[in-house]
Amino acid sequence: MKGFYLKWLAVSIGVLTLAASCRKDDPVLPSEPTLVNPWEQVTGDIYGFFLLNEGNMGTNQASLDYYDYETGVYTRNIYGERNPYEVKDLGDVGNDIQIYGDKLWAVINCSNYVEVMDVNTVKHITKIAIPNCRYLAFKGKYAYVSAYAGPVQIAPDARIGYVAKIDTASLQVVDECIVGYQPEEMAIVGDKLYVANSGGYRVPNYDRTVSVIDLKTFTEEKKIDVAINLHRIQPDNYGNLYVSSRGDYYEIPSKTFIIDTSTDEVAYEFEDLPNTHMTLCRDSLFLYSTEWSYITNDWTVSYAIVNTRTREIVTRNFIKDGTEKRIQTPYGIAVNPNTGEFLVTDAKDYVRAGTLHCFGPDGIRKWSISTGNIPAHIVFTRKKLQPLEE
């Protein structure tokens, strides 16, 4: 979900009313397999990927889709049919999804819990209660979850956030570390956990720091001053962290920065590189931006690839066949590390079902498929998904 729910400010009250009234007429698609790629069945250690659809806030429409590389079949809404006794399905607003060991973890932001599943079957294991939880990171025996801590609302006195430490064996929260306001994505380098703090609920008094947590003591050892309203954070292969700032949606634009983790200082600021979401494949950082301006009352969409070895912007558009003109609201991106294929999701108007587009390494579209509502977060799996039990 975009920080502090910008999309709810950008979408008109009429559209939000339509979202509520259309819930019965346009539900999230039921479990339904569709052959989308009959021409190419891929073998290898990556069997498929899960796509977490956020779902419109307040509707409990978060859902889980799955693509099988061996069969070329995309299946929508697999969680409900595999967990028929979970009353609210996945819950309200899926915000992150990761695989660690034999478990699939999904952050369900507005339901205030992390859903833990068996990655082989997608069967529910437990829910871990964390208020206004946001993103996941893992190392050793522990999972780490960033949390806004307070209610979902813009407020000048919004609570300071924290990172929860979860024992991956007992699936219990064992510790908490206070960080900045409205913490977002996290990255681990060595024995340090870096947390991007946004302060998005405290507009215009945004946070502008990255918290550095010593994982041995699980205490915040310092804050790195970067820029206002931070969101994404991505490590490269050279000891650097790429950090995105959303700006203030008025005069201060979205930007991308590099932190050198050997000094824990900002080492580089890109000129004209807005950044909403990014993902790394080898030395190529794929990113896109959907930048809102309250001055123009309009969105500006852009794409880019950065060479993380040279810090050069290699291209300003990695989609080469014009498909980007069909993508209304890019909302998620992932790159298959084996094949170089990349995936881009389209949330459209946040009300209708979204679309997933698959592109070859050459930037030419291979296939597209309808998804759940607000398709956002993708994780590749090296575990073969077991068929549904009869």
Indicate where each model-derived feature is located.
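C-terminal motif of bacterial Sec signal peptides marking the signal peptidase cleavage site
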Residues: 18-21
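Predominantly soluble domains enriched in secretory-pathway, periplasmic, or organellar proteins
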Residues: 23-390
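Bacterial N-terminal signal peptides that target proteins for export
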Residues: 1-9
